[in-house]
């Protein structure tokens, strides 16, 4: 077998199905590139303005094996590359119909997939009927096996390394800054710099990129802007968009970020009729709610104000970005979306790293707002790095809320404050002489204990058995809410004022004690409720 990959996890099967469906919306054809430790899927639209790429590590699959030496037929897709560490890597690439593959990868309607496998057999022992075909085997929980063999065409892999170029430029501009204007940079951002540098070193197509020298002086052509924030913010902005909106505009400043979904209006010049109505929907977010942001600001252009120089904008198609973001919905947890963009008209890069899966989207931005005829020598301001934040803004807000709730729920009171609170049940007072004599009888001793346990539920957490205050006390709570009322310790009413209420409670107690004592007597003297003319114990058929 030249290649084999197996998916047994139901969650990974759902992710695979969603990824194939998203790739097929960009283009009908999907390109596969198989390596020893990962599988690359990517597609590009017909106008070459949008590219969507997915990198699946070998750990994403339950079983992953690749033997390029066993490939004899379809050798057009084989190629050997060498990285900067002089290590050789063998690749195998092919193109397959994405529409057919998305249908075959779909989950059955009334059944669950137990095992989903992909395999290629282009060895010398393979029959001619299965050469250059991707064998798909679906084994369901109902013990049904489905096998499909769509054909593919072997091709050479032509990598598009826009992501590596942007990350290298990102490190050249911002990666050497440990502090900005005397303020220590965010340690999480510095850790992100190290992660990006490691990705560049481990990339297989980094020749001519990572070894490029850093520019001695930054100019306007070195502009690169970076934005990192939680996917929940993007999802809220997309949910506000209607089906009529076509484009998305990102406007980022030091204090605010505005995401605007809009549609340009079209008007007939002759009849002045509106052919397409203009639509605009904006969503404003403070930069305190984003993970990181780095802005590249310039000055020196007389035709540009300071506000325009500090504002960074990017306009791109909403439809492709929505399809890209829909693949992220295959996971239940939110993720961090990293974004790199340069001047208007240059590509914008979105990246989501899920550990075993990395999603990337590259789109060409609109040239609207690009300065024409700008001065070549512009003064570069100090790099504006996001302020120092020890934890994620959204996660910090959730943590503080939970901590405050737990602190309120688990608050402890001392004995003095606990006595000053009126609990749900009235405190016990001294029982009368007759009730005390009744309680000392042997027949009522156990029933009195049961009665006290039923009538003194609220006192169990406040007093011990002998009536002394307990040492370790906690307020009785239910679902995070304490049932208590009344004044503080200094304003507690005198117990004598509640004497009338205590008398009524004592009468109820005495009545209950009497009923329990009567019930504990001998069976001959008990009332079985058979009526005045009936015998207490009816005779049996053998009496």
From Swiss-Prot:
BP-aspect Gene Ontology terms: cellular response to ionizing radiation; DNA repair; DNA replication checkpoint signaling; meiotic recombination checkpoint signaling; mitotic G1 DNA damage checkpoint signaling; mitotic G2 DNA damage checkpoint signaling; mitotic intra-S DNA damage checkpoint signaling; recombinational repair
InterPro entries: Ddc1 (IPR026217), DNA_clamp_sf (IPR046938), Rad9/Ddc1 (IPR007268)
GO cellular component: checkpoint clamp complex; cytoplasm
Domain of life, per lineage: Eukaryota
Residue spans crossing the bilayer: none
Gene3D superfamilies linked: 3.70.10.10
GO MF annotation list: DNA binding; protein kinase activator activity
Protein localization: Cytoplasm; Nucleus
Stretches for region Disordered: 512-543
Keyword annotations from UniProtKB, A to Z: Cytoplasm, DNA damage, DNA repair, DNA-binding, Nucleus
Functional description taken from the UniProt entry: Component of the checkpoint clamp complex involved in the surveillance mechanism that allows the DNA repair pathways to act to restore the integrity of the DNA prior to DNA synthesis or separation of the replicated chromosomes.
PANTHER family named in the record: CELL CYCLE CHECKPOINT CONTROL PROTEIN (PTHR15237:SF0), DNA REPAIR PROTEIN RAD9 (PTHR15237)
Record's subunit section: Component of the checkpoint clamp complex composed of DDC1, MEC3 and RAD17.
Protein family membership: Belongs to the DDC1 family.
Protein name: DNA damage checkpoint protein 1
Organism encoding this protein: Eremothecium gossypii (strain ATCC 10895 / CBS 109.51 / FGSC 9923 / NRRL Y-1056) (Yeast)
């Amino acid at each position: 077998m030249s290649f084999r990959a197996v998916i047994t996890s139901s969650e990974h099967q759902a992710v695979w199905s969603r990824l194939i469906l998203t790739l097929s919306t960009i283009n009908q054809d999907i390109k596969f590139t198989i390596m020893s430790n990962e599988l690359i899927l990517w597609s590009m639209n017909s106008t070459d303005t949008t590219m969507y790429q997915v990198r699946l590590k070998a750990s994403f699959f339950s079983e992953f094996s690749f033997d390029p030496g066993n490939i004899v037929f379809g050798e057009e897709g084989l190629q050997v590359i060498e990285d900067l560490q002089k290590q050789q890597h063998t690749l195998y690439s092919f193109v397959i119909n994405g529409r057919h593959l998305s249908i075959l990868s779909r989950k059955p309607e009334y059944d669950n997939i137990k095992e989903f496998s992909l395999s290629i057999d282009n060895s010398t022992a393979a029959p001619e009927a299965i050469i250059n075909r991707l064998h798909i085997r679906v084994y369901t929980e109902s013990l049904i096996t489905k096998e499909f063999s769509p054909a593919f065409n072997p091709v050479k892999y032509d990598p598009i390394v826009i992501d590596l170029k942007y990350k290298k430029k990102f490190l050249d501009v911002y990666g050497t800054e440990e502090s900005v204007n005397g303020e220590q940079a965010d340690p999480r951002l510095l850790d992100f710099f190290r992660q990006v540098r490691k990705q560049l070193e481990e990339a297989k197509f980094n020749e001519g990129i990572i070894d490029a020298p850093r520019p001695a002086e930054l100019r306007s052509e070195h502009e690169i802007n970076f934005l990192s924030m939680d996917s929940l913010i993007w999802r809220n902005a997309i949910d506000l968009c209607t089906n009529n909106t076509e484009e998305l505009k990102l406007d980022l400043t030091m204090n605010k970020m505005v995401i605007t979904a809009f549609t340009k209006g079209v008007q007939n010049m002759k009849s002045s009729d509106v052919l397409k109505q203009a639509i605009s929907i904006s969503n404003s977010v403070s930069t305190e709610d984003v993970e990181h942001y780095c802005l590249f600001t310039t000055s020196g252009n007389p035709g540009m104000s300071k506000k325009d120089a500090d504002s960074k904008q990017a306009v791109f198609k909403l439809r492709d970005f929505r399809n890209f973001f829909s693949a992220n919905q295959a996971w239940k947890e939110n993720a961090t979306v990293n974004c790199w963009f340069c001047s208007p008209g240059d590509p914008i890069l979105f990246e989501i790293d899920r550990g075993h899966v990395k999603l990337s989207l590259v789109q060409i931005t609109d040239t609207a707002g690009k300065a024409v005829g700008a001065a070549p020598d512009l003064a570069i301001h100090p790099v504006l790095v996001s302020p120092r934040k020890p934890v994620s803004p959204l996660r910090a807000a959730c943590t503080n809320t939970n901590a405050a709730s737990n602190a309120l729920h688990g608050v402890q009171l001392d004995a003095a404050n606990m006595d000053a609170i009126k609990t749900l049940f009235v405190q016990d007072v001294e029982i009368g002489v007759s009730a005390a004599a009744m309680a000392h009888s042997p027949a009522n001793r156990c029933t009195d204990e049961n009665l006290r346990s039923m009538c003194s539920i609220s006192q169990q957490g406040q007093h011990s058995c002998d009536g002394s205050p307990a040492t370790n006390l906690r307020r009785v709570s239910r679902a995070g809410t304490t049932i208590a009322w009344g004044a503080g310790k200094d304003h507690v009413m005198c117990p004598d004022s509640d004497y009338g209420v205590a008398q009524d409670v004592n009468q109820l107690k005495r009545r209950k004690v009497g009923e329990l004592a009567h019930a504990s007597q001998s069976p001959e003297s008990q009332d079985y409720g058979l009526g005045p003319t009936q015998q207490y114990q009816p005779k049996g058929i053998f009496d």
